[in-house]
Amino acid sequence: MEKLLGYRDLNMTPREIVEELDRHIIGQKHAKRAVANALRSRWRRKQVAEPLRSEITPKNILMIGPTGVGKTEIARRLAKLAEAPFIKVEATKFTEVGYVGRDVDSIIRDLVETSIKLEKNRAKERVKSKAREAALERVLDVLVPRKKQTAWTGEEEIDPARKMYRERILREEMNDTVIEIETNQSMSANVEIMTPPGMEEMSSQLSEMFKSFGREKKTKRKMTIAKALIQLAEEEAEALVSHEEIKSAAIDNAEQNGIVFIDEIDKVARRSDVGGADVSREGVQRDLLPLVEGCTISTKYGMIKTDHILFIASGAFHLAKPSDLIPELQGRLPVRVELDALTADDFKRILTEPDASLIKQYTALFATEQLHLEFTEDGINKIAEIAYHVNKTTENIGARRLHTLIERLTDSLSFDAADRRDGDRVIIDAAYVEKTLGEISNNEDLSRFIL
């Protein structure tokens, strides 16, 4: 069944999941273990026979830690690893039902949209070779119209010209040749419905209604063969996939494998020392409760049960405490993990160890201009020390501080890169970092505004 639906039956042990997360995220061992156990529990649940399987619910997680330490990245990487529908929302964007603002049910609708897109891409990937072949035939029909069937065999004659053009197109020798092709264009393609905040569902319903009224018509367009192949392959793939199967698979994938990450949950916790009514706090928690407990939400694709969706809530909890959340919601977030603030050593590892570390990214970017950046060990240590120092003396924004520092560090290089000689080498050592960032980092007032 799962193979038919297209999503992965992830049979990785928690240890293997943590090792995979270690390739992208530094530290936060406890948080990684918690999400790895949650993902493995999903696999275990699938091995249990019904009716007990449907009674086993996911153990939702509450992550507590300052901004920029990896809370969102852990959840995002986990979803990517499982190839599961994933959505990140901010609790502060939602208000209690009856007030102006987004309704919490839209979280599940957005999750289903993500799942539909995921399943559609998978379905198109499965028919990719057929679609490309059909697109190639349509391009060849423009260049060399098909010959009629022979009277004796009823088969098409093999046209040498058609065969020659096919080989040239496959060798990409005709990519820039301009041809005129017929493409599909829906009558409602350019209709966009604008609705007030909180009424996105009405917008999608109206769009669907106009789409059903609109009919597809053929339009002739001139484009290069390279672009024509892409456009026509997309059309052919759209025709080859079964939209009913995609919808069914997407709903099942969202229900069984969906991951919802609710950020800034602490901002809707009602602090005990603050009185008065607060629409965006306790009311939002009470509206979130049915989703987390398990309920059925109506979407344009059908009814979605949230019983087995994994919810990961996170917050810094600087002013509020986890105990300030309503007791019912606390009970639905049984796994608590506290993430550590980043040290100077963590910053150093973040700069160098991940598969797509910042240093690798910037080195690759400048290499496109034939400018070779070399970060020395003392230079990396200095950047890490400054990041830690600025976070400590101003606002702690975690690893995001490194983006600001390196952007500042490479600002003049980025501006002048195109004017430099090819093959230039720039060594970024401790002296270079001190010269560029030292004065700003030591001046607290400047740090607040610039770094």
Curated annotation (Swiss-Prot):
It is found in: Cytoplasm. Pfam families: AAA, AAA_2. It comes from the Bacteria. The keyword Cytoplasm applies. HAMAP family: HslU. InterPro entries: AAA+_ATPase, ATP-dep_Clp_protease_ClpX, ATPase_AAA_core, Clp_ATPase_C, HslU, P-loop_NTPase. ATPase subunit of a proteasome-like degradation complex; this subunit has chaperone activity. The binding of ATP and its subsequent hydrolysis by HslU are essential for unfolding of protein substrates subsequently hydrolyzed by HslV. HslU recognizes the N-terminal part of its protein substrates and unfolds these before they are guided to HslV for hydrolysis. One of its GO terms (cellular component) is HslUV protease complex. It comes from Dichelobacter nodosus (strain VCS1703A). Its main location: cytoplasm. GO terms for molecular function: ATP binding; ATP hydrolysis activity; peptidase activity; proteasome-activating activity. A double ring-shaped homohexamer of HslV is capped on each side by a ring-shaped HslU homohexamer. The assembly of the HslU/HslV complex is dependent on binding of ATP. The keyword Chaperone applies. One of its GO terms (biological process) is protein unfolding. Belongs to the ClpX chaperone family. HslU subfamily. Disulfide bonds: none annotated. Keywords: ATP-binding, Chaperone, Cytoplasm, Nucleotide-binding, Stress response. ATP binds at I26, G68, V69, G70, K71, T72, E73, D263, E328, R400. This is ATP-dependent protease ATPase subunit HslU.
